[in-house]
């Protein structure tokens, strides 16, 4: 069961990735984790990646694809894997196919921008413990204060409305074209593409995913 998760930041992919890993016993493959462990291990690819990153450049698709190939050849990926945050662009998706990396399911989490902005800009965090609140959906007992310590809650830079909107526009520009790309492959019978309504309650989304993938 080889799965790609698509969806804007804040669409709920992380929560559902956790559910899929626990339910189906497949690992989540994060390109960030792979880069860090390759650099730590001092492998050839790791050295190449480190040089590029030290120069403040973006790591090339070629290096990332090689890392993905190495990672999915490991024993824990025998029954499948979950890719989140990769591919981000059509050239990356093409490179995956050219390298024989097959995908069974592409799951897109569809949530309107305004709901994402509301979800993320309403988050408040207690820096000491990492406890997360939401001004509407999960408010603290006292506005702006942590329930347990009474200390101030903060808005993470990533959750500020301006930042959220910027990340959404990058997603629409770079990654959204992948939706069409995988829909086309799905029509050709080369993968299964499914759009999930990410505005539903978390449990409902998990239930839908479970039903879909157990078919």
Curated annotation (Swiss-Prot):
Sequence positions that bind AMP: 31, 36, 57-59, 85-88, 92, 156, 167
InterPro entries: Adenyl_kin_sub, Adenylat/UMP-CMP_kin, Adenylat_kinase_CS, Adenylate_kinase_lid-dom, P-loop_NTPase
Catalytic activity: AMP + ATP = 2 ADP
GO cellular component: cytoplasm
Gene giving rise to this polypeptide: adk
Biological pathway: Purine metabolism; AMP biosynthesis via salvage pathway; AMP from ADP: step 1/1
Assembly with partners or alone: Monomer.
Description of its domains: Consists of three domains, a large central CORE domain and two small peripheral domains, NMPbind and LID, which undergo movements during catalysis. The LID domain closes over the site of phosphoryl transfer upon ATP binding. Assembling and dissambling the active center during each catalytic cycle provides an effective means to prevent ATP hydrolysis.
Keyword Metal-binding: no
Keywords tagged on the record: ATP-binding, Cytoplasm, Kinase, Nucleotide biosynthesis, Nucleotide-binding, Transferase
GO MF terms held by the record: adenylate kinase activity; ATP binding
UniProt region (LID), positions on chain: 122-159
Protein name: Adenylate kinase
Ranges of compositional bias, category Basic and acidic residues: 133-144
Organism, as annotated: Idiomarina loihiensis (strain ATCC BAA-735 / DSM 15497 / L2-TR)
Name of one Pfam family that matches: ADK
């Amino acid at each position: 069961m080889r799965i790609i998760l698509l969806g804007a930041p804040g669409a709920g992919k992380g929560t559902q990735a956790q559910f899929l890993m626990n339910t189906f016993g497949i690992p989540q493959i994060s390109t960030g984790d792979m880069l860090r462990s390759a650099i730590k291990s001092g492998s050839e690819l790791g050295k190449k990646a480190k040089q590029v990153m030290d120069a403040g450049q973006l790591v090339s698709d070629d290096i990332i694809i090689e890392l993905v190939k190495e990672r999915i050849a490991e024993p824990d990926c025998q029954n499948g894997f979950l890719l989140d945050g990769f591919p981000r662009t059509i050239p990356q998706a093409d490179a995956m196919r050219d390298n024989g990396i097959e995908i069974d399911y592409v799951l897109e989490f569809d949530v309107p921008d305004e709901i994402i902005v509301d979800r993320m800009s309403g988050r408040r965090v207690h820096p000491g413990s990492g406890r997360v609140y939401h001004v509407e959906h999960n408010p603290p007992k006292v506005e702006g204060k942590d329930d347990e310590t009474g200390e101030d809650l903060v808005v993470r830079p990533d959750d500020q409305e301006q930042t959220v909107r910027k990340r959404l526009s990058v997603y629409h520009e770079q990654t959204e074209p992948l939706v069409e790309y995988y829909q086309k492959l799905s029509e050709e019978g080369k993968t299964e593409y499914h759009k999930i309504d990410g505005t539903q309650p978390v449990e409902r989304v998990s239930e839908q995913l479970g039903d879909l993938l157990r078919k």
